[in-house]
From Swiss-Prot:
<dbReference type="GO" id="GO:0160148">
    <property type="term" value="F:tRNA pseudouridine(55) synthase activity"/>
</dbReference>
<dbReference type="GO" id="GO:1990481">
    <property type="term" value="P:mRNA pseudouridine synthesis"/>
</dbReference>
<comment type="function">
    <text>Responsible for synthesis of pseudouridine from uracil-55 in the psi GC loop of transfer RNAs.</text>
</comment>
<dbReference type="Pfam" id="PF09142">
    <property type="entry name" value="TruB_C"/>
</dbReference>
<feature type="active site" description="Nucleophile">
    <location>
        <position position="44"/>
    </location>
</feature>
<dbReference type="Pfam" id="PF01509">
    <property type="entry name" value="TruB_N"/>
</dbReference>
<keyword id="KW-0413">Isomerase</keyword>
<dbReference type="InterPro" id="IPR014780">
    <property type="entry name" value="tRNA_psdUridine_synth_TruB"/>
</dbReference>
<comment type="similarity">
    <text>Belongs to the pseudouridine synthase TruB family. Type 1 subfamily.</text>
</comment>
<dbReference type="InterPro" id="IPR015947">
    <property type="entry name" value="PUA-like_sf"/>
</dbReference>
<dbReference type="GO" id="GO:0031119">
    <property type="term" value="P:tRNA pseudouridine synthesis"/>
</dbReference>
<keyword id="KW-0819">tRNA processing</keyword>
<protein>
    <recommendedName>
        <fullName>tRNA pseudouridine synthase B</fullName>
        <ecNumber>5.4.99.25</ecNumber>
    </recommendedName>
</protein>
<dbReference type="InterPro" id="IPR002501">
    <property type="entry name" value="PsdUridine_synth_N"/>
</dbReference>
<dbReference type="GO" id="GO:0003723">
    <property type="term" value="F:RNA binding"/>
</dbReference>
<dbReference type="InterPro" id="IPR020103">
    <property type="entry name" value="PsdUridine_synth_cat_dom_sf"/>
</dbReference>
<dbReference type="InterPro" id="IPR015225">
    <property type="entry name" value="tRNA_psdUridine_synth_fam2_C"/>
</dbReference>
Length: 297
């Protein structure tokens, strides 16, 4: 019997520079011959690296992994700010960074590490009164997005280069979903009084998915294969709880099980190794939050 989910799962793409995340989705729709394609976590056109894309029922799973932590390698230029907070924008202000000492840079980076309030980049996909912020900025509007809590668990300097009036910092960042690396560049430049923006960005991790898992687009065009089946995606993203065939059937129908004292979300896997659902304890019930293999399939 053919598995109804054999074409459902995730593709981990190494996005090239110059393409939007939506461009990548469009190509994968053509490669996999389906309209049911979506991505988790937008990458700016200038950015490269890990873009997780759902295929078929894998698109339904994306909503349950967007809160994952992410990691980036980036280059920050100190000495000028831009209206987009990256190299694609127009310069707005700046001061020579020649007098900025390494100790001052380290101090301000430490202040941007941990649980912080961050103002998102104005040129972003965040919606303001139903319209994306970047659309309002490009229409000439002034957009000031409110700060929101994010977590920067790692903000390390890998290399420092002093070139004329500028300082270029190669950095490695690990952060919560929703953190803007462009905003870190902007805020570091502002704190140092010289302005700052991002000149390069490469995403190296999204949750459990890393560059080692990623495939270039040209390879996917030649051989459109899933990086992980939906079964593998659930089991890799969450701790596994083995269930009986009877329990699996109940979960597939959206029914709940007796509580087991579990904390957090688990992937319920049947004796055949198939991921049936994501489950959480809610009060006195062990209930589904996402059913990968509904009984209606």
């Amino acid at each position: 019997m053919t598995d109804p989910l054999e074409r459902s799962g995730l593709v981990v793409v190494d996005k090239p520079a110059g393409m939007t995340s939506h461009d990548v989705v469009g190509k994968l729709r053509r490669f996999f011959r389906t309209r049911k394609v979506g991505h988790a976590g937008t990458l700016d056109p200038m950015a490269t690296g890990v873009l997780v894309v759902g295929i078929e029922r894998g698109t339904k799973f994306l909503a349950h992994m967007v809160a994952s932590t992410k990691a980036y390698d980036a280059t920050i230029r100190l000495g000028t700010a831009t209206h987009t907070d990256d190299a694609e924008g127009e310069a707005t202000w700046g001061e020579p960074a020649t007098a900025v000492e390494d100790s001052a840079i380290a101090r301000e980076i430490a202040a941007l590490t941990g649980d912080i309030m961050q103002r998102p980049a104005a040129v972003s996909a965040i919606k303001v009164d139903g319209k994306r912020a970047h659309e309002r900025v490009r229409a000439g509007e002034e957009v000031e997005l409110p700060a929101r809590p994010v977590t920067v668990s790692r903000f390390d300097i890998l290399a420092t280069r002093r070139e004329g009036e500028f300082i270029d910092l190669d950095v490695s960042v690990a952060c919560s979903s929703g953190t803007y690396i462009r905003s870190l560049a902007r805020d570091l430049g502002e704190a140092l009084g010289v302005g700052g923006h991002l000149t390069a960005l490469r995403r190296t991790e999204v949750g459990p998915f890393r560059l080692d898992d990623a495939h270039p687009l040209d390879a996917l065009e030649d051989s459109p294969e899933l990086s992980l089946s939906l079964d593998e995606a659930l089991a890799r993203s969450y701790p596994v709880l083995e269930v009986t065939d009877e329990e699996a059937q109940a979960l597939a129908m959206g029914k709940w099980l007796e509580p087991r004292g579990l904390k957090g979300t688990y992937a319920a896997v049947d004796p055949q190794g198939r991921s049936i659902a994501l489950i959480q304890e809610k009060g006195k019930r062990l209930a589904t939050v996402f059913v990968a293999r509904p009984s209606t399939l």
